Amino acid sequence: MVDTLGLPTVFFTHSAADLQWPELARLICPDDPDSSTSRSKALMENPAIADWFFYHRIHKFIDIFYKGVLGASDYWMRFEWQHRGSPHVHGLAWLEDAPNVETIFSATSDREANTPNATHDPSGSEDSTLHAAKQQLIEYINRTVSTINPAVLPDGSNVADAPLPKTNPHICTKPYSEVVDYHHDLADLIATCQRHTRCSAAYCLRTHNGVQKCRFGYPKPLQPQTAVLMGDNLNSDEDKEPVIITARNDGLLNSFNPVQLSAWRANVDMQYCVSRHKVIKYVAKYATKSEPRSLPLREVYTKPEG
């Protein structure tokens, strides 16, 4: 797939707000769609309908957002289900107008190999071309992927005063058609769906050398502006592949596209792809990953008769 289509542009994740989405509530409990108790009960009794709804929603979203807004020429995705049955999807999208990352990095590597003592001064003609290409890439990334919290100052100094999650009523119960103030709505969605605020040993905390750390790397260091780091500029000897670090003013914020989040109205993720090796490794992992059997079903089959 990667050999045929080339390096995909973005990696994406979409989760379900199946207890909040009003469209699903009207489908599975039309008599009382505003009751959280009725929604929860109907969801447990109609898991197949909820799964169909998610499947239909993401395919429509692919057509309207990824193909229509971002100009995707192709995509790949893989569905997963949590133990309680709530689905999410991981995927890749190839965007037609995206800068060719591999060409830029290859040209930079060739330049450094041929001129090991180069200072990378953009005043030279060849360096100027590479500098312009990298700048074009950075501008495209800034339009496509964000780790900026609009409710926080650029330097992140007031992040402690960021809005709290909006859960009563939950922000995801409001359909996009009823949004009056886009920026205020986006800030509420970010606060509720995109901030990694609940680290726990059961979920993400791992102990290494006696120190507990989040396996997702939160809180992440702040970044004043988006940067493209080549292999030789990285501290790790294990990974010399290029890395893109997006501008960040909130160390707990998961990456997203503002239009993606506003329209989907549940937790999302979007990251820019820079490594063919990592993409192939990722696809192989998720394409061959099996779903764990549910504990109740296993108990039913193993329970002695009588």
Predicted regions and their residues:
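Intrinsic low-complexity, intrinsically disordered terminal tails and linker regions enriched
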Residues: 1-89, 93-306
